[in-house]
Amino acid sequence: MNKIISILKPTGMTSHDVVSRVRKILNIKKVGHTGTLDPDASGVLPICIGKATKVCEVILNKDKSYICELTLGISTDTYDASGEILKKVDDFKFSNEDIERAFDTQRGEINQLPPIYSALKVNGKRMCDLVRSGRQSEITLKTRRVNIKDIKILSIKGNKVMFYVECSKGTYVRSICHDIGEYLGCGAHMSFLNRTSSGKFDLDNSITLEELELFYENKTLDKYLYDIDYVLDSFNYVVLNPNAIKYYSNGGSIDDKRFLKNNFDKDDEFVRVYSTDNFLGLGKLSKHNNTISVKSDKMFI
């Protein structure tokens, strides 16, 4: 099985726990996830199976969206509800306009400082592990450029603010909550997080682990198994002449005289490569004089 399936991760499980369950249910060893969701978070977690693990990075690089709850007045060291409380402020009062202005600081391209309790690595070690082992002095936090493509408040009830956010790879929603609290001066942390989409996967085409087990046993899982090229539709394509397939599959470079069909642009670096019947993989284009050729970069056959 070389497919992609999107799982609705429940709270209380790590992303690796989900991978382990999928391995056990499907009895397949080669399984990988496409972007860590913290144990306290829930939602969409695409899982790659078999040769589809080669495109984990492609899905990881896609935009993601979340529903999040921010709690004003309480700051924690992890920026979420699992951490130690660093500051508690009770006597604050903000208008909805004040809170809207704070959210406006988290819109568009921004420089974001990640939480020190994160899986980002310093010299091969996760920052959260370094902190927990008393080696925080080895860490120098650096801002990262991220893109908050959409952020909107859904409701404000007391010190709880529910909001929707769509953002680029590498964005920490915990940091958004923390930074809004710092802007307002009362502190804040993330008290709930549900990922609603990851690339082309959302709540509608994702299933629970219980459904995965049931559908697999009943042989009705096919509806939720996606081909590898489903997540590669941002790449243009080339269809090869049948007599070029073997040479291409063995690492040979195929020039455009043996393309049956294509829709690539002159500036494309990679394309999807097909035979007349099957998806073969991703190919890398090269140009020499007036000839364009394609050579295998990732094979999926």
From Swiss-Prot:
<keyword id="KW-0819">tRNA processing</keyword>
<dbReference type="InterPro" id="IPR002501">
    <property type="entry name" value="PsdUridine_synth_N"/>
</dbReference>
<dbReference type="GO" id="GO:0031119">
    <property type="term" value="P:tRNA pseudouridine synthesis"/>
</dbReference>
<comment type="function">
    <text>Responsible for synthesis of pseudouridine from uracil-55 in the psi GC loop of transfer RNAs.</text>
</comment>
<dbReference type="Pfam" id="PF01509">
    <property type="entry name" value="TruB_N"/>
</dbReference>
<dbReference type="InterPro" id="IPR032819">
    <property type="entry name" value="TruB_C"/>
</dbReference>
<dbReference type="GO" id="GO:1990481">
    <property type="term" value="P:mRNA pseudouridine synthesis"/>
</dbReference>
<keyword id="KW-0413">Isomerase</keyword>
<protein>
    <recommendedName>
        <fullName>tRNA pseudouridine synthase B</fullName>
        <ecNumber>5.4.99.25</ecNumber>
    </recommendedName>
</protein>
<dbReference type="GO" id="GO:0003723">
    <property type="term" value="F:RNA binding"/>
</dbReference>
<dbReference type="InterPro" id="IPR014780">
    <property type="entry name" value="tRNA_psdUridine_synth_TruB"/>
</dbReference>
<dbReference type="Pfam" id="PF16198">
    <property type="entry name" value="TruB_C_2"/>
</dbReference>
<dbReference type="InterPro" id="IPR020103">
    <property type="entry name" value="PsdUridine_synth_cat_dom_sf"/>
</dbReference>
<comment type="similarity">
    <text>Belongs to the pseudouridine synthase TruB family. Type 1 subfamily.</text>
</comment>
<feature type="active site" description="Nucleophile">
    <location>
        <position position="38"/>
    </location>
</feature>
<dbReference type="GO" id="GO:0160148">
    <property type="term" value="F:tRNA pseudouridine(55) synthase activity"/>
</dbReference>
